[in-house]
Amino acid sequence: MARKIFKYKGYTLEELQDMSLEEVMELFPARQRRSLKRGFLPRQQIVLDKMRKLNKEGSKDGRPVVIRTHCRDMIVLPEMVGTTFGIYNGQNFVEVTIEPEMIGCYFGEFAPTRQKVQHGDPGMGATRSSMFVPLK
């Protein structure tokens, strides 16, 4: 079975990577377009510079290099596809490898800050009514 070719608003990944930032910006939704029109923040520029440097020289031992960042408001650009980022979620760094489907999204969407609480069985002293729960 043939693998489906990724397209973002009718453009393939190669076409997106050949476009300038201004041309790609016009394809993004309004919120991302507005953010990019204002320019990159200094911390976002640092992330971009690190990524471009590592993509140019590559890793020394063949393993993918993880770029760690606290910058959760960075927008995924076409040139980032294939790069691995460690995105901080407030407790630790979540490793995310950027795929073509992530273009136009924010880093923070891939590293949730809250986890669903999973409560255990009530034990002795867990609640007022647990005084009558037999001990296991």
Swiss-Prot record:
Which InterPro entries does UniProt cross-reference here? Ribosomal_uS19, Ribosomal_uS19_CS, Ribosomal_uS19_euk/arc, Ribosomal_uS19_SF
UniProt-annotated stretches for the region Disordered: 117-136
The GO terms this record gives for MF are: rRNA binding; structural constituent of ribosome
Does the UniProt entry include the keyword Ribosomal protein?
A: yes
Report if keyword ATP-binding is assigned: no
> Membrane-spanning residues where?
none
One GO cellular component term, please give it. cytosolic small ribosomal subunit
The UniProt entry, under NCBIfam families, shows: PRK04038.1, uS19_arch
PANTHER family recorded: RIBOSOMAL PROTEIN S19P FAMILY MEMBER, SMALL RIBOSOMAL SUBUNIT PROTEIN US19
Function of the molecule: Protein S19 forms a complex with S13 that binds strongly to the 16S ribosomal RNA.
Give the protein family.
Answer: Belongs to the universal ribosomal protein uS19 family.
The name this protein carries in UniProt is: Small ribosomal subunit protein uS19
Look up and give the organism this protein is from: Methanobrevibacter smithii (strain ATCC 35061 / DSM 861 / OCM 144 / PS)
**Name of the gene this protein is made from:** rps19
